[in-house]
């Protein structure tokens, strides 16, 4: 069974809004708009060398970020998470400082975004899209992933929403959707959850059988509550990388039950489907 390792360490809420630290002095609106923006990421509490940065930015002594000059570039280090902004060498720098225990294999750091304490990254493969989210808050959150297909760059064809309830602290999850059009956009919204997440050890799920037409899942609920299990599954290549054809499904399990569920693949899924991720919450 393939699934993301869940790290249960509680963390403080991420300051997604970030803070602006920059050079003293004023600049015109026109001049600001002309500056090139550089987007990079760094890990909380660890040194990041910014190679193309030659000048040490001037920052307030009250900030939790530091810079030092080396022969290879400027060393950056932050003791705060979230988005850090500063200006230097005629450029706008935006550094997304991510938690040290983010499951790094599931995220492309250069594409990372953050909203209300949830980090997420999106990928596409032809008409397949998937968004992996990670909750760095110290409370359960509901994450809504909206996928919009466009007939062209500006004409909306349809939008579909998928809500993942009670994503636990330190938990990551992968949404999948099959696009109807070549042009599509993804967005994520986050709210504090009214649901209660279920610990990983209380739930078991695995791929039972699979073929071109359908996939069956074996699921066990060891809790005294009725729960909903969210399953993300996809084709993986020989290196374990997501290749194509992903789906996300809801499975409701009665208390203390063992169930087998069969889900149609609509004929386009290959026959080496594996579970990429799953998590569960108490059903209201």
What does each model-found stretch correspond to?
Residues 40-42, 155-183, 242-269:
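Intrinsically disordered, low-complexity Pro/Gly/Ser/Thr-rich segments with frequent PxxP/GP/PP motifs
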Residues 101-126, 190-213:
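Low-complexity, acidic Ser/Thr/Pro/Gly-rich terminal tails and inter-domain linkers that flank the onset
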Residues 171-215, 266-284:
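Terminal connector regions
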Residues 21-36:
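Sec-dependent signal peptide cleavage junction
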Residues 34-60, 171:
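Solvent-exposed, low-complexity, repeat-rich "mucin-like" stalks and linkers
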Residues 80-90, 229-231:
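A short beta-strand micro-motif common to beta-rich folds, especially ectodomain repeats
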Residues 132-139, 219-223:
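Asparagine-centered strand-capping/turn motif at beta-strand->loop junctions
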């Amino acid at each position: 069974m393939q699934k993301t390792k869940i790290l249960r360490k509680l963390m403080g809420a991420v300051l997604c809004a970030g803070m602006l630290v920059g050079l003293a002095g004023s600049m015109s609106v026109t001049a600001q708009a002309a500056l090139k923006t550089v987007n990079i990421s760094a890990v909380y509490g660890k040194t990041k060398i910014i190679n193309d940065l030659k000048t040490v930015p001037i920052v307030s002594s009250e900030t939790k970020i530091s810079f030092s000059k080396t022969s290879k570039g400027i060393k950056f280090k932050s003791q705060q998470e979230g988005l850090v902004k500063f200006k230097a060498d005629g450029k706008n720098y935006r550094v997304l400082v991510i938690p040290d225990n983010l499951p790094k294999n599931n995220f492309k750091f250069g594409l990372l975004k953050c909203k209300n304490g949830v980090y997420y990254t999106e990928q596409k493969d032809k008409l397949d899209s998937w968004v992996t989210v990670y909750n760095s808050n110290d409370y359960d959150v509901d994450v809504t992933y909206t996928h919009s297909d466009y007939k062209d760059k500006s004409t909306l064809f349809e939008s579909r929403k998928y809500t993942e309830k009670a994503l636990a602290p330190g938990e990551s999850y992968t949404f999948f959707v099959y696009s109807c059009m070549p042009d599509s956009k993804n967005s994520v919204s986050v709210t504090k959850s009214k649901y209660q997440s279920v610990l990983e050890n209380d739930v078991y799920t695995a791929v039972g059988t699979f073929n071109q037409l359908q996939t069956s899942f074996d699921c066990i609920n060891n809790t005294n509550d009725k729960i909903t299990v969210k399953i993300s599954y996809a084709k993986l290549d020989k290196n374990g990388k997501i290749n194509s054809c992903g789906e996300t499904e809801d499975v409701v399990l009665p208390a203390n039950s063992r169930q087998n569920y069969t889900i149609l693949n609509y004929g386009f899924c290959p026959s080496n489907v594996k579970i990429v991720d799953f998590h569960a919450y108490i059903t209201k």
